[in-house]
Amino acid sequence: MESHERAGHGQVMDPDASGAGGPVNEGVGQLDQIPRPAHHILASLDIEMGDVKDGVLRMGSLVEDQILAAHDALLNRDAALAQKVITSDGRINEVQRAVTAIVAMTIATQAPVASDLRFLLALDRVTYELERIGDHAGSVAKQARKLAGVTIMVTYDELTPMAELAARQVRDVVMALVDIDETRAREVAARDDEIDRLYHQVFDDVLAEMRTDPAKVDPGTRILFAAHYLERIGDRVTNIAEDVVFLATGEVEDLNP
């Protein structure tokens, strides 16, 4: 979902200010001191909150695409696709900076109540986690780029369901955050155990092949690094789920003890 540019938030316009000079023009400089009606403040805050949500949803979508594309690049040893994933990280960083700027402006100009403030700060923290997830996807793509042209490979069947689950986890936890859905957040966190199981399976399978065939040590190491980055994505998702639980309950809880 794209964020929309807005202009003039917080401005109070006198309907006669465009006319001839006189007492009205003399007071134009003081218009910004006139308090806005409460419903205008609330409407503006709603717009700002909506833009922050849109930015987080956009980041989540970009990161999800990155994970799946990085996996495809690894599976097919596609250097061009891997490079595309690596380059696209800049777009995620741009969205993060935009969201952070909106959060800062909203806090400074709208004086949100405690619950809205917690929500805004949580969304800002989540953009950091999503940015790091994007970095992990980029790291998977870098391993894929290094494997381009390699003819001797190891078996890593469990990496595909691992990448698919990691992408799904990102999508689900972002939706849980936007809706402040505690139940969904807990379900997402619980599924991290499956990512861990798949990671250990990949690790055991690849290590076994590396031990029996020295030619597979280098490609096997690349696959193990890729699996590690996917496992780290799962941990980052759990961090976001913990933020959702805090927003819903006010309690700080470790969902990955």
Label each PLM-derived region with a short phrase.
Residues 1-257:
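Cytosolic, long alpha-helical scaffolding segments
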